[in-house]
A protein has these predicted regions:
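Cell-envelope/extracellular polymer assembly enzymes that use nucleotide-activated donors
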Residues: 3-5, 36
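Short, well-formed alpha-helical segments that are part of the catalytic scaffolds
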Residues: 13-28
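Short beta-strand/loop segment that forms part of the nucleotide-sugar
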Residues: 33-43, 64-65
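A conserved acidic beta->alpha catalytic loop
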Residues: 41-50, 99-100
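Acceptor/aglycone-binding surface of glycosyltransferases and processive sugar-polymer synthases
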Residues: 66-68, 72-82, 94, 100-177, ...
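Short acidic donor-binding loop at the edge of a beta-strand
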Residues: 86-91
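Catalytic donor/gating beta->alpha subdomain of glycosyltransferases that bind UDP-sugars
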Residues: 167-226
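Membrane-embedded multi-pass helical conduit in multi-pass membrane proteins
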Residues: 228-287
Length: 287
C-alpha cells in the first residue's frame, strides 16, 4: 500500500483550506493508499479553524506552526525538510491552499509519479484565471526570466514526486528561494503536465506587480551563474557588433549592476541555519 503526504502552505486562509480539504477527500477516493496532510501554518494571525469530521479518506492532518511569517516558498521548504527528517517513504504532493491548484487533478499527478519514480511531476499552467492585467504581468515575468536564465518556468507549487527524490531536491538551498526554480535547477528529470489554473475559492488574488518582481528576483538568483554567462556573452556580442564607446560603457555598467545585485541578493537571503528550527510546534488535528 502506498503512503501519500499532501503538503499545503497556508497563511490566514483557513476558510479556503477547509474547502480544499473537502475537495481533496473526494478527489483521492478510490486511490489505494494512506493519505496524510501536512499544513505549514506560516504564522497566521487568524485563529486556526479546520473541520475534519467527514474527511474519511484522509487519515491524518498535522499542522506545523511556524515562529514567524516567511512566505509560501520557504514554508514549502520547511515542510519538505520535515518529511525528509522523519524518513517516511511516500509520494509527496504539494498544493496551494487557495484552490487555484485544482485538487481534482491531483490524481493525475499522483498516477504519473507512481509510474515515473525518478521524475518530479509538475503542473504547467495552461490557462490562468486572473484578470487581463495580471495575466499580462505574468507573461512579462515568463519572458523576462527566460531571457535571463534560458529556462521557461511556467509551473508553480502544484506537483508530485517520490520522497526518494528529496535528496537531489536538497542538493543545495535553491528551494529556499523559489520552489519552481529550485526544482528546475536541481532535478534533471521533470515531467510537465498541462493543467488549468483555477480561480481562488474566496477573496482576491494576492498577486500584484510587487509580488511578481520579488518572485522573479528569487527565481533568477537561483540561476546566477547562468545569468552571468548569458549576460556576458550578450554584452560582448553587442560591443563587437556596434563598437560604440558610449553604448559599450552603458552595457558594461548594466552588466555589473545586474550580476552584483543578483549575487548580493542570493548571499544576503541564503539559508545559513537549520530551517526546522523555525517550527514553533506541531499539532495533530486528525488521527
Amino acid at each position: 500500500m502506498n503512503n501519500f503526504f499532501i503538503l499545503i502552505p497556508s497563511f490566514n486562509d483557513w476558510v479556503s483550506l477547509n474547502k480544499l480539504l473537502f475537495h481533496l477527500n473526494k478527489a483521492v477516493q478510490g486511490v489505494e493508499g494512506k493519505f496524510k496532510v501536512i499544513v505549514v501554518n506560516d504564522c497566521s494571525t487568524e485563529k486556526i479553524n479546520l473541520k475534519t469530521k467527514n474527511l474519511k479518506n484522509i487519515k491524518n492532518i498535522k499542522i506545523l506552526n511556524l515562529k514567524k511569517n516567511i512566505g509560501s516558498q520557504k514554508a514549502i521548504f520547511i515542510g519538505l525538510k520535515y518529511i525528509q527528517k522523519i524518513n517516511y517513504k511516500s509520494i509527496i504532493a504539494i498544493l496551494d491552499s487557495d484552490g487555484e491548484d485544482n485538487p481534482f487533478k491531483l490524481k493525475k499527478l499522483i498516477n504519473l509519479a507512481l509510474k515515473k519514480k525518478k521524475f518530479i511531476v509538475v503542473a504547467d499552467r495552461s490557462k490562468r484565471m486572473e484578470n487581463i492585467f495580471l495575466r499580462f504581468l505574468n507573461y512579462l515575468r515568463l519572458i523576462g526570466t527566460f531571457f535571463l536564465t534560458g529556462k521557461y518556468i511556467n509551473f508553480g507549487n502544484f506537483s508530485a514526486f517520490y520522497s526518494t527524490n528529496l535528496k537531489k531536491i536538497f542538493l543545495n538551498n535553491n528551494l529556499w528561494f523559489a520552489y519552481s526554480a529550485g526544482i528546475l535547477k536541481n532535478c534533471k528529470k521533470i515531467e510537465r503536465v498541462s493543467i488549468e489554473k483555477k480561480k481562488r475559492y474566496y477573496g482576491a488574488s494576492k498577486v500584484n506587480l510587487t509580488f511578481l518582481l520579488s518572485h522573479s528576483l528569487k527565481i533568477i538568483c537561483v540561476f546566477k551563474k547562468e545569468i552571468f554567462v548569458r549576460s556576458f556573452f550578450a554584452v560582448t556580442l553587442i560591443i563587437l557588433i556596434f563598437k560604440n564607446l558610449v553604448l559599450d560603457i552603458k552595457l558594461i555598467v548594466l552588466f555589473l549592476i545586474l550580476n552584483i545585485s543578483v549575487y548580493a541578493y542570493y548571499q544576503i537571503n541564503n539559508l545559513n541555519f537549520d530551517a526546522l528550527k523555525l517550527i514553533k510546534n506541531k499539532k495533530n488535528i486528525k488521527n
